[in-house]
Amino acid sequence: VDRLVGSEMCIRDSLKKAIMLSFRIYPMDNLSGPYSSWYDKAHLLKGKTANWTKEQHEAAGFRMTPNSPVRPGSFIGKNAVLMPCYVNIGAYIGAGTMMDTFSRAGSCCQIGENCHISAGSGIGGVLEPAQALPTIIEDNVFVGAMSEVVEGVIVGEGSVLSMGCYIGQSTKIVNRSNGEITKGRVPPYSVVVPG
């Protein structure tokens, strides 16, 4: 997201296109490590923090446990905690957010500050398959274990998604107090349960 104009997102399509073009022009390559070897696009094989010193980690200000791949081109805010998780190219993880064990931040998704993305949960990306809008998790959101939020859905500030929620653009979100049905956006300070 380049910026918000009122409540509308302005997307910088040129950046998304540049990332997608990089997949076509860079060759595949091999990288061997202590546990395995990997075969991927050469420019993505080494993670964002490959060869960082202790001082560089301290300056970045986030905690990163072993086996937490963070691809180049992503952003991790201060005081974020990355348990063994996966952060794809272009993803934005806000300050103070926890990416819990085996959670995933998809390409170019936006996760706000002080969020908790619980174990096994996924926040969808925009590159594969190509999507028009990124998935956005606003500040102070809790996403329960084994949940998926995809297809450019926006989860409003302060919301809680219970365990096992699957939310895409076609998912009906029902306001229990008035029966109103929305799609594509979870209103701020909502509590969402599947069913």
What are the roles of these predicted feature ranges?
Residues 58, 62-194:
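Structural signal for interior beta-strand "rungs" in well-ordered beta-sheet cores
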Residues 1-6, 10:
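Single conserved hydrophobic/aromatic residue that forms the stacking wall/gate
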Residues 9-11, 40, 53, 188-192:
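Serine/threonine-rich low-complexity intrinsically disordered regions
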Residues 15-61:
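A contiguous, low-structure linker/loop signature
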Residues 9, 24, 28, 164-168:
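Generic secondary-structure signature for well-ordered alpha-helical cores
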